[in-house]
């Protein structure tokens, strides 16, 4: 996803939305009809079916990934406290699809008992998450109306005393916490929660605290084989919507504005019962025109080069796709050769990053070697690829930023691992002879998966030809 900000006044928003319905009603209706014909209205099944699949992913993640990662980082016991609506970033990797927030205060405790017994999982507050955790509740019984007496939930400072009891029973040599100055995904423990916990546990236990660092990062990044199977379908859906958006079913040259296309793309997801993790964006490049001359929300004209950035969110998993399109001029039957060459150049840069992205290498190492090959082949480009999964800009080793091509300290020093996904995001700029050697930017983004053996695969495929508006 590119960082892009468009500020629209309410009047501009209403005008943009009105233009879809009043200026090009037939195109919009056709787009909706075509999309409905080609994509089921429940592309991933009912919510219940989706939740059952997600619950299986959670169980496998806890049974398979968590023990391996705790041992990889030498973590005996991991404590993850959080309060309702102030959840740790790793929350998404720890809970069932029917859990949307922490319960009052929830303290998850993970204790590695060794390869034979596995990892003990406790929930001090909150529920068992479909049998994944053993919950602890308060001792007192309270009257619950017609249900009679019911065991109370853990509440307030007493929860820390229950945690202290758990620690005293298990006597871990160290206690890993989510505090980090490097990784946002490993820095989920709030200052208030830290203070309350430290005060209740006392100095003897506080001395055993240590940062969890890579554990929450890699747990968030770790993908299950069935998630990979699902991701192909999710990526296909993103492609389907982009293909329709960059066609005459949505775009009428000389009438449709880029904001019309953006809102159509977002609305299409809402109509399917899905969501996105960022506002879709569309931009144009035009022969002889600068960005300033085009303005914030230009009308799409014949001869324009189109670019979009689009993400789908489904079953808590995210896609991130950037594609190129072209609006044929009157009498044109194909994309000018110079523009085709520009797309081919960015495809070549994709090849390079695809080949360099390997488990065991740091993000900065991947960036450096990719840029060296890029320079040796005379490509004028930038690389800013990132992990993706439970978050759009996901946990794991960062491979460049658009404005930090020398490397990213900290985040870029983390290592790529097997069983994770990336968005290969980059751009190559080329001179286009048909445009009087104007510089044209071909920006592409496609998602890839890395399997358990470290092999890299496109999540579905990658764009090698322009989408055409005729």
Model feature map: region roles:
Residues 18-20:
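Bacterial signal peptide processing site
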Residues 8-16:
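Bacterial N-terminal signal peptides
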